[in-house]
Amino acid sequence: MADAKIYTALGLMSGTSLDGIDAAVIQTDGTSIHSFGPFETKPYHPEFRGRLREAMGTREISAKLERELTHMHAELIQELSKKHDLMSSDIDIIGFHGQTTQHEPANQFTLQLGDGALLAELTGRPVINNFRAADVAVGGEGAPLAPVYHRALATNLGQPIAIVNIGGVANVSFISSDKLLAFDTGPGNALIDDLVLARTGKSFDQDGQLAAKGRVDKSSLTNFLSHEFFKQPPPKSLDRNAFNISVTDRLSLENAAATLVAFTTTAITRSASFFPEPVNQWLVTGGGRHNPMIMKELSERLGKVVQPVESVGWNGDAIEAEAFAFMAVRSLLKLPLSFPSTTGVSEAMTGGDLHHPN
């Protein structure tokens, strides 16, 4: 039997934290990862980020906003290619996630801004986008999708293992030798970022300094945790805007930040009750791993050492973009992206729309 073809894939991710666009290159056959290539990021300009925030929670696509966003992705690919001496022809496939503005799986609706056909024209390379739509259309949650990549990454690690991605929304992947279970745990950084932006004009709590000075308000925490989402068994997914920071309006900035950190970490900790067995190791990826208060509280609540994914040699800033490079190849090969135990679909299924340049 001939060896499987190894593809050079470039993945693009702009997450619910709204901080910018990540681009990463990997080489993969769609099953295993052969090598990691370059990674670059492009922060959103504050004015553009503000316009994206205004688009959150709406079902309408602004053609102008989508076009601008797509051009930004093309610019990042060009910057990465130039910096790392990568020829356009070296890239076999581009995985383009786009920017989620609305996610309502209960209504079989999910929307990611980003024009795949336009990106294919701008780059001259085939592009796969719209990764979540097929899953949602048949009643799946459409998220999380990265677990199939987490499983490939964790092949040589001691299992069972939990990989937590703390972006705007937090999700967890439970991986053992014969099981893959994944679901959103609750808010990640989104509420903390929204709080800091509303009260200070800054985009996040640098090094968790505000939360470190505050005290948790137990009544607000109880209020957050009483949400129906936490009563649901997995698989389940969460829209970035499912919760509102108005619950913390009466609190000082520091106490509100501490309460929101407690909310994120308590929700992640409670997720372990759904695992089929205890895990040997907790690894954290996403922006939340840079917040010392989140990492400290997570370790304390779990009663285990929680480490960033860099401790096992991965790049936590690149993983989400790498995941969509990996999924682009799987989509090309008609391999599954989602499973009954990750999104609730009735059977494993692929997804994504392929666009070729003219």
Where are these regions (language model features)?
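Short glycine-aspartate micro-motif
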Residues: A9-M13, D90-G95, I161-N165, A182
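Glycine-rich phosphate-binding/hydrolytic loop that grips phosphoryl groups
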Residues: S14, L18, A262, E310-N358
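Short beta-strand-loop/turn "lid" adjacent to the catalytic site in phosphate-handling enzymes
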Residues: E60-G116
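Glycine-rich nucleotide/cofactor/substrate-binding loop typically near the N-terminus or early
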Residues: Q27-D85
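Active-site neighborhood for divalent-cation/phosphate handling
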Residues: I93-L157
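A contiguous, well-structured pocket-lining segment that forms one wall/lid of small-molecule binding clefts
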Residues: K202-Q281, P292-G303
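Short glycine-rich phosphate-binding loop at a beta-alpha junction
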Residues: M87-H97, E277-G288
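Glycine-rich phosphate-binding loop plus the immediately following alpha-helix
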Residues: I21-A24, F36-E54, I128-T155, A162-K231
